[in-house]
A protein has these predicted regions:
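Hydrophobic core segments of transmembrane alpha-helices in multi-pass, intramembrane catalytic enzymes
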Residues: 140-149
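Membrane-interface alpha helices of multi-pass inner-membrane proteins
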Residues: 161-177
Length: 177
């Protein structure tokens, strides 16, 4: 048993596993893979995308639109600004960029945490599976987690106004109708 633990420890102590670049590309890859496998099953992204178009067209945000998606929207009008760059792109590109940007936002917020790199690496490896699960559902919760971590970062840096901006942004974007 001890030999197995030692071999496992030795395997994972290789530089590849502790290199932030490895994790950066892994997280970008998770964004790409999740988007490429979900082109036809991305109901959450469709809801998000149509928040922008319904806001743009002045149509009600919280009514059912069964021809467009299979649920109802719960996001506030401010969310239409967040999703706009992805909504105006052709569907496959919008979905790919949405997933990659979500992964990138959380990766960068974790990398900014005021802790030693080894602990950041551990968090990134630990969260990779949860990231993939959330990406498969195109969930906005990834961005909310990044906003929370970024708010903490700015509070620690004594940039309370910037932290408050992120807290308000997260609240108004995720505001349920």
């Amino acid at each position: 048993m001890n030999k197995t633990i030692e071999k496992t420890r030795e395997f994972f102590s290789r530089p590849f596993f502790s290199n932030p670049k490895t994790l950066f590309w892994l997280w970008i890859g998770l964004g790409l893979i999740s988007a490429l496998t979900k082109f036809h099953k991305c109901n959450n992204f469709l809801i998000f995308k149509y928040v922008f178009w319904h806001t743009w067209n002045g149509t009600p945000l919280y009514e059912a639109y069964p021809a467009e998606y299979f649920d109802v929207n719960h996001y506030g009008p401010l969310f239409s600004l967040v999703i706009a760059p992805f909504a105006v792109l052709p569907h496959p590109l919008g979905l790919i960029f949405w997933h990659v940007i979500l992964a990138l936002l959380l990766y960068l917020s974790i990398r900014k945490l005021p802790m030693e790199q080894g602990k950041q690496i551990l968090i990134l490896w630990f969260c990779a599976h949860e990231l993939l699960t959330a990406l498969f559902m195109s969930q906005f919760n990834i961005a909310i987690a990044a906003i929370i971590v970024a708010s903490y970062y700015f509070i620690e840096r004594e940039r309370e106004s910037t932290a408050a901006f992120f807290i308000v942004l997260g609240t108004f974007v995720k505001l349920y109708g």
